[in-house]
Amino acid sequence: MKDVSISSLENMKLKELYELARHYKISYYSKLTKKELIFAILKANAEQEDLLFMEGVLEIIQSEGFGFLRPINYSPSSEDIYISASQIRRFDLRNGDKVSGKVRPPKENERYYGLLHVEAVNGDDPESAKERVHFPALTPLYPDRQMVLETKPNFLSTRIMDMMAPVGFGQRGLIVAPPKAGKTMLLKEIANSITANQPEAELIVLLIDERPEEVTDIERSVAGDVVSSTFDEVPENHIKVAELVLERAMRLVEHKKDVIILMDSITRLARAYNLVIPPSGRTLSGGIDPAAFHRPKRFFGAARNIEEGGSLTILATALVDTGSRMDDVIYEEFKGTGNMELHLDRSLAERRIFPAIDIRRSGTRKEELLVPKEHLDRLWSIRKTMSDSPDFAEKFMRKMKKTKTNQEFFDILNQEWKQANLSSARR
């Protein structure tokens, strides 16, 4: 019998893997990708030895040295798997690593499953995990690869973002949203665009302090990993889930992967920290402690493009005009930390104009690194022609609806400008 470990399986040709799949009686093996087939073989091999093959996201108990793999929603549950301190040290495992391996059921006096052997770390050979560079040691750069979000002609939100506030791999973006301005619909459109256009990227949707029915809606609408801590959970759980998601994203970036976190919302995460941290003795307007900003800023500031390969993109919503002074202070504190902002306009939403994007106030820093020069010239021309008329956004979107792609929209604008220049020259 051949050696059944992830390193040996990765070195096998597809024909050899198919032979093993037939040996283990795996159904539909020809329809699986190589990575899926490898994990199906590992699982079948474990079951043959009367063991389970399970995986989860590692959370290390710092004071004790051992840890638990969290298989469900990055949160503690009865399905957690115990992993010993010696295994953590041997493979240089870190918080947020997704660890897969053979697991035995709990004995009489035990509460948790026990991990017997580490088969894979973040989908790779565990030995290669030792050679990873730590996330803080990686070199951050400005985003220089555009993440194209345009998909279907009727998805105007993502088409407008590509034009007016382009998103790059490694972007740190704020979606500034008043209530009832279409924030949730926008997040779903962005998530589905990422899934369609960037299938290789790792997408995580993080929902903090949201309504349970909204979580269900997004889980059913989005193909990525949806992680949530609903408003009926304690603030400590919001913080633990958010920090483990960030650690998970960092570990993937260390493996040179492009990771995208869509977060709703940074405002509620900052509120949770304000309730949990020890008081510093100082209070800002709205009743928020200045010390409560440190860890949410660490979360948001982790977004970066990496010179050595990979990137972490964070698009987080910030709530404004909620009637709470604290929410406005939180937005003001985060306003200068991002390198892209997308503003939603409540007045447009009240007039039933969707997407309710404030085109004038939305934009990206260093957009010249993302957008081709000919598109950039057209974009600046559009910005120059923007009037203060409240009907401008409505006219702009009406014109967009008549075109199927952004390229077609730019071509029509070019023709209109040429005709306008000719008529002015004749005069």
Swiss-Prot record:
It comes from the Bacteria. One of its GO terms (molecular function) is ATP hydrolysis activity. It is an enzyme of class 3 (hydrolase). SUPFAM superfamilies: Nucleic acid-binding proteins (SSF50249), P-loop containing nucleoside triphosphate hydrolases (SSF52540), Rho N-terminal domain-like (SSF68912). InterPro entries: AAA+_ATPase, ATPase_F1/V1/A1_a/bsu_nucl-bd, CSD, NA-bd_OB-fold, P-loop_NTPase, Rho-like_N, Rho_factor_ATP-bd, Rho_N_sf. The keyword Repressor does not apply. Keywords: ATP-binding, Helicase, Hydrolase, Nucleotide-binding, RNA-binding, Transcription, Transcription regulation, Transcription termination. ATP binds at residues 168-173, 180-185, 211. GO terms for biological process: DNA-templated transcription termination. Its EC number is 3.6.4.-. Residues 51-125 form the Rho RNA-BD domain. PROSITE patterns: RHO_RNA_BD. Homohexamer. The homohexamer assembles into an open ring structure. Facilitates transcription termination by a mechanism that involves Rho binding to the nascent RNA, activation of Rho's RNA-dependent ATPase activity, and release of the mRNA from the DNA template. Belongs to the Rho family. PANTHER family: TRANSCRIPTION TERMINATION FACTOR RHO (PTHR46425:SF1). This is Transcription termination factor Rho.
